[in-house]
Amino acid sequence: MPASMFSIDNILAARPRCKDSVLPVAPSAAAPVVFPALHGDSLYGASGGASSDYGAFYPRPVAPGGAGLPAAVSGSRLGYNNYFYGQLHVQAAPVGPACCGAVPPLGAQQCSCVPTPPGYEGPGSVLVSPVPHQMLPYMNVGTLSRTELQLLNQLHCRRKRRHRTIFTDEQLEALENLFQETKYPDVGTREQLARKVHLREEKVEVWFKNRRAKWRRQKRSSSEESENAEKWNKTSSSKASPEKREEEGKSDLDSDS
């Protein structure tokens, strides 16, 4: 055998390199969108050798459909399936090196070529949890800690609106009649009334709580009105007393004359 077959170049050329065996990417007419705040930084925060190696393994492929949008920026910054980061809704395509096969997005299955950052293991990680897309326009996700991401998610989660019960006239009449009898009905009485008016006992209990609060407000306002009326009567009587005295004095003078 010729000695050239055992040269380093021939040996390395025969082995498939993970770096050069990325799945082919469909060409797109539009130029890919570049995010300046995300470009150049890896998911793990620091920009160095690990960042460049990771970017070499995973170049920015074009999203399926020919829209010209990157499915991953500097690694897997946007490579989470169906999550919003920045102003881009990413449908992550199964891209990856050929030595590992077509790999699903990070979080579902880890590729042996991609190192797992410490503190963010598996699909239960905070980074995999959906963060509202209004919160991360051009934001470096790798610089945020676990606590900061949790606080962002909690602050911007939409609160569920409570369903307000609409009572019929018959139900309101029955509830009001019982309220006139007792302000604090027991559980048995509430259950009996609930069966009568086709309501749940919890709804009856909430109605009585609200009705008692309204009754206390009305009672407080009526007492304040009565107190104000008494004060006004006292002040009006004190102002009218000198006039009455003058009239009484004039009447006394007339009687003397």
From Swiss-Prot:
Gene3D superfamilies: Homeodomain-like (1.10.10.60). Residues 160-219 bind DNA. Residues 213-257 are annotated as: Disordered. InterPro entries: Goosecoid-like_HB, HD, Homeobox_CS, Homeodomain-like_sf. Keywords: Developmental protein, DNA-binding, Homeobox, Nucleus. GO terms for molecular function: DNA-binding transcription factor activity, RNA polymerase II-specific; DNA-binding transcription repressor activity, RNA polymerase II-specific; RNA polymerase II cis-regulatory region sequence-specific DNA binding; RNA polymerase II-specific DNA-binding transcription factor binding. One of its GO terms (cellular component) is transcription regulator complex. The keyword Nucleus applies. Residues 241-257 have a biased composition (Basic and acidic residues). SUPFAM superfamilies: Homeodomain-like. Its main location: nucleus. One of its GO terms (biological process) is middle ear morphogenesis. It is found in: Nucleus. Belongs to the paired homeobox family. Bicoid subfamily. Regulates chordin (CHRD). May play a role in spatial programing within discrete embryonic fields or lineage compartments during organogenesis. In concert with NKX3-2, plays a role in defining the structural components of the middle ear; required for the development of the entire tympanic ring. Probably involved in the regulatory networks that define neural crest cell fate specification and determine mesoderm cell lineages in mammals. This is Homeobox protein goosecoid. The gene is GSC.
